[in-house]
């Protein structure tokens, strides 16, 4: 019986994870559930899964959550704050940690799980974007098993031989990272500035949280995944090619030196990669319907349009520049997306703000997580300063 800690259980990935776990009560038990501020849903989840701990990141919500839990005669113990997140993620009782907290907020608890040598199901791409070298070094030192949950990286993982050592040893010529192009793939460029948060969050294929939905609309999500893939698979930027695939049926591909291309296919549902990683190397039922090849209308592919998606170009440039450029990229993006979702800036301002932050950025090679966090804080402050010039 695996003991599971779900970091970010009230988010899109967390909810999908619990859906899979509920189907396999003989295999998995929930040790801890965590949320940022969604008390109502967290209470519901505690009543259903009876975890030993429930952690709320916002310490101001500790008492309200504790009172709710106690009033329902639930035996779950309530904790609060970032340190509590790190504690449950690294607890000796825990076998696997689903790292599904969105954004930079997920770095500390995810790293705590890695340093404790856990089996880490990585859905928090920002951990690798911000601290890729340090993160992978920590995983190696602690013998932690990092399994990718992002559908694209999970697809690549499935297409690579195991055990995997390097692209060269595996005979890999190129990784083909696919992306749908989001809801604005065919929108006239002149119309992009008027797009609303609700329009940006209406993804044609995937059901996701609002932040990642906006990232998909700008294709920054693919840019962050590009950086993540470099670290996960020890690849250079030149060894990864982004392919726009509108149907989201092929989740990524690996091209080998002998001319073969292996692709992982399936209906667009995050429960598939979640189930794949939860009991890897064994396969379990995810609850996702099998792909009906006879119902497919076709599979299309094209190159990304960097004029339409300047955020994607900024991301690929950031990993090539190295240092703390990816940290600044991620921080500026989180600030800009939050302002856009609050309707304080235009959709096209997101990439413009990121570009302005990177243009003024003074990079260094961070040798500690503290240095990464310091760079993150500086970049956020700079992003707000830049955003003020856009009317915020």
Curated annotation (Swiss-Prot):
Native species: Saccharophagus degradans (strain 2-40 / ATCC 43961 / DSM 17024)
Origin: domain of life: Bacteria
Keywords: Isoprene biosynthesis, Manganese, Metal-binding, NADP, Oxidoreductase
GO molecular function: 1-deoxy-D-xylulose-5-phosphate reductoisomerase activity; manganese ion binding; NADPH binding
Reported cofactor(s): Mg(2+); Mn(2+)
Coiled coil: none
Family: Belongs to the DXR family.
Name of the featured protein: 1-deoxy-D-xylulose 5-phosphate reductoisomerase
UniProt-annotated binding residues for NADPH: 10-13, 124, 126, 209
A Gene Ontology biological process term: isopentenyl diphosphate biosynthetic process, methylerythritol 4-phosphate pathway involved in terpenoid biosynthetic process
Keyword Iron: no
Pathway linked to the protein: Isoprenoid biosynthesis; isopentenyl diphosphate biosynthesis via DXP pathway; isopentenyl diphosphate from 1-deoxy-D-xylulose 5-phosphate: step 1/6
Cystine pairs: none
E.C. code: 1.1.1.267
Catalytic activity: 2-C-methyl-D-erythritol 4-phosphate + NADP(+) = 1-deoxy-D-xylulose 5-phosphate + NADPH + H(+)
PANTHER family, A to Z: 1-DEOXY-D-XYLULOSE 5-PHOSPHATE REDUCTOISOMERASE, 1-DEOXY-D-XYLULOSE 5-PHOSPHATE REDUCTOISOMERASE, CHLOROPLASTIC
Function: Catalyzes the NADPH-dependent rearrangement and reduction of 1-deoxy-D-xylulose-5-phosphate (DXP) to 2-C-methyl-D-erythritol 4-phosphate (MEP).
Residue positions binding 1-deoxy-D-xylulose 5-phosphate: 125, 151-152, 180, 203, 216, 221-222, 225
Record-linked Gene3D superfamilies: 1.10.1740.10, NAD(P)-binding Rossmann-like Domain (3.40.50.720)
Top EC class of this enzyme: oxidoreductase
InterPro entries: DXP_reductoisomerase, DXP_reductoisomerase_C, DXP_reductoisomerase_N, DXPR_C, DXPR_C_sf, NAD(P)-bd_dom_sf
Pfam families: DXP_redisom_C (PF08436), DXP_reductoisom (PF02670), DXPR_C (PF13288)
Binding residues for Mn(2+): 150, 152, 225
